[in-house]
A protein has these predicted regions:
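Short hydrophobic/charged patches on amphipathic alpha-helices used for structural packing
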Residues: 41, 45, 75, 101, ...
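Short, well-ordered beta-strand segments
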Residues: 2-7, 52, 86, 110, ...
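Hydrophobic hinge/microswitch elements
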Residues: 45-50, 114-169
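Beta->alpha turn/N-cap motifs
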Residues: 36-37, 53-60, 88-89, 140, ...
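Flexible hinge/capping segments at coil-to-helix
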Residues: 67-109
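Secondary-structure junction motif
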Residues: 12-15, 61, 97, 101-130
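N-terminal winged-helix
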Residues: 2-43
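Pocket-flanking alpha-helical
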Residues: 41-44, 48-66
Length: 169
């Protein structure tokens, strides 16, 4: 059995899909856990997962590196990325090339709940310390995407979008 724990990223799910396809065996057992930041670390530490995928920034790196060391978990950087606004194609700002935080102020920022470890150091999104006028937290990616459409919400992310998994909306 091979298991991966990850924060809520479609690029990580896509990579998992590619691994399963590449194995090409008649029988196998895999597990994927899309979960909160602390749970990703716990799952790797307890060997529930062989691999964990997390977002590190200059802001949270020292705290998370300390946790990795305390939990005897090794961090390997996969890539670096910029920050992008993620919103649905029908959003009033969707046609803009660039969007400022001030322009986003009247729309709800959508973020992933981190449970008992709801420190901004555990946030999956960049700018977790910014004072948002409207903030909604959700537990899963499907709910976040529904809120994005239903409330013209947005989130801040890496910009790595997998259309074949997310769709084009």
């Amino acid at each position: 059995k091979f298991s991966v724990s990850m924060q809520h990223y479609t690029f990580a799910v896509k990579a998992f899909v590619e691994v399963v396809k590449a194995v090409g065996m008649d029988e196998y057992e895999f597990a994927v856990h899309e979960t909160q930041t602390n749970q990703v670390i716990e799952n790797v530490r307890n060997m529930k997962s062989e691999l964990g995928i997390l977002f590190l920034s200059k802001f949270n790196e020292a705290v998370l590196q300390k946790l990795f060391k305390e939990n005897d978990v090794i961090f390997e950087e996969l890539f670096t990325c910029d920050t992008y606004v993620y919103l649905w194609k029908g959003h009033p700002l969707a046609d803009k090339e660039e969007i400022t935080l001030e322009e986003l102020r009247e729309y709800p920022c959508l973020s992933f709940e981190q449970g008992g470890y709801n420190s901004f150091y555990f946030a999956e999104e960049v700018l977790s310390t910014y004072e948002y006028k409207r903030l909604i937290k959700a537990d899963d990616r499907a709910t976040l995407l529904n809120l994005m459409v239903g409330l013209n919400g947005y989130t801040l992310c890496s910009g790595i979008i997998c259309e074949e998994l997310n769709g084009s909306d």
